[in-house]
């Protein structure tokens, strides 16, 4: 496994693979890698095959944070990250500094104006512009044949697919299932900031969503399903719901009636730690 910190190094290493038309599979991450990331990397290794290459980027992207304290406290575990990458069969790790990725005079950004109008896009202004901009840069740098993203960030996955479609990036986007702890809590880099008590409390998100799916499939109105889920979450001390919505799983627009494809998505604070999760209804 080789590690690069500059764009020039990465491009030079990938040149021979592009000339041979090898499979190049990209897994973009912000580090603090956990079992969910490991599953993405292992899926990438299978997809690339023996002759292809897997590229993992590790970059805490400053322009997708709308809260400076969130950026400063975001977990960073560089040594462990490299161990996870090597164990999963990654060929190249790209870990640039912010000044390597962005010029101080940066004036171009990629915006998405429809799918990002709800959920995380509404509660975190500018977030998805930052995501789309860094991914556009990574797609240009790596020129992957394939890229893999987790479904925990369901809205992000939908936006990435739209960006690839609308801007004609020649890359296949793959969505990977959410990896969970035995109690149902979704793996997240932010889990490291939870207290032991909060980790137990955070299971309520999954419990509320499983109840919501049962109610929705039984024919309950979306508004009632959402009301019951919110009550379950708010019944846990110290929680604060950022958003809890039932949306069309393709357009990310809120739905009031019982129809499919539908998705329940939530962002919930436990203390000052914000966790997201979703479930297809």
UniProtKB/Swiss-Prot annotation:
Q: Name one GO molecular function term.
A: pantoate-beta-alanine ligase activity
GO BP annotations of the record are:
pantothenate biosynthetic process
Q: Which Pfam families match?
A: Pantoate_ligase (PF02569)
Q: What keywords would UniProt list here? A: ATP-binding, Cytoplasm, Ligase, Nucleotide-binding, Pantothenate biosynthesis
Q: Where is this protein localized, as stated in its record? A: Cytoplasm
- The positions annotated for binding beta-alanine are 64
Question: Residues that bind (R)-pantoate, according to the entry?
Answer: 64, 156
Q: Which residues form the active site?
A: 37
> Which residues participate in ATP binding?
30-37, 150-153, 179, 187-190
Which superkingdom?
Bacteria
Identify the Gene3D superfamilies for this entry.
HUPs, Pantoate-beta-alanine ligase, C-terminal domain
List the pathway annotation: Cofactor biosynthesis; (R)-pantothenate biosynthesis; (R)-pantothenate from (R)-pantoate and beta-alanine: step 1/1
EC number(s) reported in the record: 6.3.2.1
Q: Which reaction does it catalyse?
A: (R)-pantoate + beta-alanine + ATP = (R)-pantothenate + AMP + diphosphate + H(+)
Query: Which family does the entry's similarity section mention?
Result: Belongs to the pantothenate synthetase family.
Its function, per the record, reads: Catalyzes the condensation of pantoate with beta-alanine in an ATP-dependent reaction via a pantoyl-adenylate intermediate.
**Its quaternary structure?**
Homodimer.
Q: Which HAMAP family match?
A: PanC
Concerning PANTHER family, the annotation shows: CYTIDYLATE KINASE/PANTOATE-BETA-ALANINE LIGASE, PANTOATE--BETA-ALANINE LIGASE
> Remarks, anything else?
The reaction proceeds by a bi uni uni bi ping pong mechanism.
Q: What is this protein called?
A: Pantothenate synthetase
* Record organism: Akkermansia muciniphila (strain ATCC BAA-835 / DSM 22959 / JCM 33894 / BCRC 81048 / CCUG 64013 / CIP 107961 / Muc)
